[in-house]
């Protein structure tokens, strides 16, 4: 029983390493606890169970706030909302369980190799699986804890997954020091931090002379109001009012996801009208909207204004690729659809865009866009960044989750994308956090949550491609796979020798 509560406790501890708490050492302590309780357990099955319980403590505390949207907007009572969160947490807990099984089976001996190579390689593989299987859900990899920590300088080189790799090594060295009663592993940790900390002051980019005035509008429209068809005109007027106030002082105006609460066809007259006004002022508007293409609906980003006339089939458009499971896309549709129909739940089923898409072209600026939680898929973002990319853009609607910690977690993961790519990131969110993030991941300016306001800044383009944009996770993933292939053959050899 003590081991069960210990596993849950250490898993729960991890959440305070992320925003809004930002106590980054908590992730090291949390992983230290996971490694201690599983390496101290000689039975593989029992170790896997403890890994699963650590995952429950970790993921339930990290994503509990999803119940707000399930309860308030889908009409599911609180009890069943919590059950759904537990089921999702249980699914996500399979990945730390895989991590424990891999380390226990392939690296049974408690030594330097286990904690410096075996455990971090196993973690890398389990996290890659979490980001790929089904729709993928790489929410809060432990590397995100370092956005304000001493290892953040590694992000432009090895990305958030690489930082996670290093954190597993550091936690592992703490465990090794505990078991061996030796200070040498601690010296190794000091060596790692001493070696990597100066990277925090190194710039992988240079600032161009090219800049533009950008305005980000935060409408702060409640989700209840947004889904009310009688409020559509009022919501649009709210955004128009602020837009007219700043149109003379900004070149690019950005509205968030769901700013236009109707599809592109239904709002065509409104779009043509505002497009005309923008052209007179020689400004651009970038906004989220639902688009219809070949009988399929897409969550998309469109551009208005500029030199070309507005067309609903314009190529200067973006279609969301990573759709939110259950919110925008029903996974395992053939199995789950009949169940949801019996429960009387009608879910949206959008079509996803292509993995690779053109950058948005605004004046002579090239912008890599993303919508909502797509910003957590760092590998896809970096694959769409080109040598001529000027900015990253993400638009979101976090009003589904109220004043919980969810929007803050989301915001800090966006900061990591700016740091990994060396690009300014523009973030417009319906109710916050609307902000401009610098190419070093630092906050340039932001609006408070839950206000109806705008952010107006001159933003400079940056030049340069970081090592992470070039190579991604490939070097570390390749190394991890090679480690397991070698370990597998060693394991087979030992079995034969034993027999």
UniProtKB/Swiss-Prot annotation:
Biological process terms in GO annotation: lipoprotein biosynthetic process
Pathway: Protein modification; lipoprotein biosynthesis (N-acyl transfer)
One MF term in the entry's GO annotations: N-acyltransferase activity
Transmembrane segment boundaries: 18-38, 50-70, 82-102, 105-125, 156-176, 182-202, 476-496
Membrane topology: Multi-pass membrane protein
Active site per database record: 257 (proton acceptor), 320, 372 (nucleophile)
Keyword Cell membrane among record annotations: yes
Main location: membrane
Function: Catalyzes the phospholipid dependent N-acylation of the N-terminal cysteine of apolipoprotein, the last step in lipoprotein maturation.
Listed name of the protein: Apolipoprotein N-acyltransferase
Organism, as annotated: Wigglesworthia glossinidia brevipalpis
Gene name of this polypeptide: lnt
